[in-house]
Amino acid sequence: MTALPARGEVWWCEMAEIGRRPVVVLSRDAAIPRLRRALVAPCTTTIRGLASEVVLEPGSDPIPRRSAVNLDSVESVSVAVLVNRLGRLADIRMRAICTALEVAVDCSR
């Protein structure tokens, strides 16, 4: 990784436990350089149709295959495992991700 990730970006993440997969950066930009960590949501090609998922499409989103952002599986990772930036999601897509995260952590009450 040469540059720090930013909120709303999609990066390839390489971890021994999960291998290589795209993730969406959820952390606020101010926290990333101080903590050297980022809260990320993994992308999966298994689309379950849950309210806690957001489907991304190649062509309109910076993702190689049709995938779902899984907001039930967010985790904090070292920026060192974020190895290649794929691009940035549109604001409308990030709003959908925030709504799905609210569902995943049951904060809508």
Swiss-Prot record:
Keywords: Endonuclease, Hydrolase, Nuclease, Toxin-antitoxin system. Induction: Repressed by Mce3R. It is an enzyme of class 3 (hydrolase). It comes from the Bacteria. GO terms for molecular function: DNA binding; RNA endonuclease activity. InterPro entries: PemK-like (IPR003477), Plasmid_toxin/cell-grow_inhib (IPR011067). Signal peptide: none annotated. One of its GO terms (biological process) is negative regulation of growth. Toxic component of a type II toxin-antitoxin (TA) system. Upon expression in M.smegmatis inhibits colony formation. Its toxic effect is neutralized by coexpression with cognate antitoxin MazE5. Probably an endoribonuclease. This is Probable endoribonuclease MazF5. It comes from Mycobacterium tuberculosis (strain ATCC 25618 / H37Rv). The gene is mazF5.
